Regions:
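Catalytic nucleotidyltransferase
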Residues: 2-4, 107-144
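Active-site-proximal "nucleotidyltransferase
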Residues: 1-113, 118
Length: 144
């Protein structure tokens, strides 16, 4: 049984994972299955030497804001589909990131085979929260 505690998050109530073993299981699953580390940076700083490569090959580039960086992980736990926000940073004094279970409606196949988005939570001018996706790391278990 997964130990969670309800907390306020982005103007909603979500379930915060409390047990370090549950968190470590998810962190290990991402790393051992897909070599994805929670705290690895996923951006590069542009240098002049990169421009010839960009000019000669099709690329999609996004700007990153100062939002809070999270993974949105669609997976199953005990055969139950679950959507998890995994904080991309570990707060001082902690060994693991915050992991939150949220209620989103995605196709079941995305959960069964693991899907992972990278993005930022951004608060709008009217105090609403948006998750802006800037990367797709896994699509149904396949590295993208």
């Amino acid at each position: 049984m997964i130990k969670t505690k309800p907390i306020s998050f982005c103007n909603n109530i979500v379930d915060n994972f409390m047990d370090s073993k549950d968190k470590q299981f998810l962190i290990d699953k991402l790393y051992n299955s897909y070599q994805i580390s929670i705290t690895d940076k996923d951006y590069i700083i542009m240098k002049d030497s990169y421009f010839p490569i960009l000019k000669n090959n099709l690329h999609y580039v996004t700007l990153m804001s100062n939002g809070n960086k999270y993974f949105l992980y669609l997976t199953t736990l005990n055969d139950i589909p679950i959507c998890l926000f995994i904080d991309r940073k570990v707060k001082d004094g902690y060994n693991q990131p915050r992991i939150l279970s949220v209620k989103y409606d995605f196709h079941l196949e995305l959960h069964k085979k693991d899907t992972l988005f990278g993005g930022e939570l951004i608060k709008t001018n009217n105090n609403k929260w948006k998750f802006v996706i800037y990367n797709l790391y896994l699509y149904c278990g396949e590295d993208k």
